């Protein structure tokens, strides 16, 4: 849906720019303002009150969305031997070691997440400049550097997402599809927000959640009340 299209303008007119919405209201509006031609992804953007230039204010983590993302992630696994066999059995889409690294160096990036066993990380470091900027570098903090490749693959295939603050102090993550029930979207939002709040750096001062916007890939942004940090599926009290 182009921002200049009639459909986009009509969708944008449904949003009151003089107010902020509860997570449940935002989920309903996201569904209403999404293009009817495709099952659009519902995304969240959050501006955090942190300084990402400071190492102690880096916000990152993972969350298992209770209702999944609506998309089965493609997973790459760096492993050999029995661990590689376990990754294949768990449903990994591409598994390898030096061969997979060479393939990625050649331009292959047809996967949404990457997992590595600890013994492979020295090799994977050779492609850190390729994977890192795309948020694909395996990391122990997100559970993607692990000897238990079966669990890691199952978690990601089951709706586990990663979040990481960017240089502008923004977080971006997916909470589902426009075809989801609004309560499922609100519950996914709540699960992610709980983890983001838990990840708040102790050195962060002032307001942590500065701005929250929900949108679909085809629709306008919907401002969400950043002070709502519980009871995500409740209708707001009418004033």
Curated annotation (Swiss-Prot):
Q: Which Gene3D superfamilies does the annotation name?
A: 3.30.190.20, 3.40.50.790
Could you list this entry's UniProt keywords, alphabetically sorted: Repressor, Ribonucleoprotein, Ribosomal protein, RNA-binding, rRNA-binding, Translation regulation, tRNA-binding
Q: Which family does it belong to?
A: Belongs to the universal ribosomal protein uL1 family.
Entry's Gene Ontology cellular component terms: large ribosomal subunit
Q: Which InterPro entries match?
A: Ribosom_uL1_bac-type (IPR005878), Ribosomal_uL1 (IPR002143), Ribosomal_uL1-like (IPR023674), Ribosomal_uL1/biogenesis (IPR028364), Ribosomal_uL1_3-a/b-sand (IPR016095), Ribosomal_uL1_CS (IPR023673)
Query: What's one GO BP annotation on this UniProt entry?
Result: translation
Q: Which gene encodes it?
A: rplA
HAMAP family in the record: Ribosomal_uL1_B
Q: Name one GO molecular function term.
A: tRNA binding
Q: What binding partners and quaternary form does the record give?
A: Part of the 50S ribosomal subunit.
- The name of this protein is Large ribosomal subunit protein uL1
The protein's role, per its UniProt record:
Binds directly to 23S rRNA. The L1 stalk is quite mobile in the ribosome, and is involved in E site tRNA release.
DNA-binding listed as a keyword? no
């Amino acid at each position: 849906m182009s921002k200049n299209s009639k459909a986009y303008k009509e969708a944008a007119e449904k949003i009151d720019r003089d107010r902020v919405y509860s997570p449940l209201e935002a989920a309903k509006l996201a569904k209403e303002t999404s293009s009817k031609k495709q099952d659009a992804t519902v995304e969240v953007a959050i501006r955090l009150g942190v300084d990402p230039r400071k190492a102690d204010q880096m916000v990152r983590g993972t969350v298992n969305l209770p209702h999944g993302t609506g998309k089965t992630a493609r997973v790459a696994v760096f492993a050999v031997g029995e661990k590689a066999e376990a990754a294949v059995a768990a449903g990994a889409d591409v598994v390898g070691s030096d061969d997979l690294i060479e393939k990625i160096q050649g331009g292959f990036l047809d996967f949404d997440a990457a997992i590595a066993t600890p013994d492979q990380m020295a090799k994977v470091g050779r492609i850190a400049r390729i994977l890192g900027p795309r948020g694909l570098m395996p990391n122990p903090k997100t559970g993607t550097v692990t000897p238990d490749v079966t669990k890691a693959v199952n978690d990601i295939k089951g709706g586990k997402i990663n979040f990481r603050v960017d240089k502008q102090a923004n977080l971006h993550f997916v909470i589902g599809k426009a075809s989801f029930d609004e309560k499922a979207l609100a519950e996914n939002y709540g699960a992610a927000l709980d983890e983001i709040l838990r990840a708040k750096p102790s050195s962060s001062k002032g307001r942590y959640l500065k701005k929250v916007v929900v949108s679909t890939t085809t629709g306008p942004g919907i401002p969400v009340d950043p002070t709502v940090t519980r009871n995500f599926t409740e209708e707001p009290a009418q004033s």
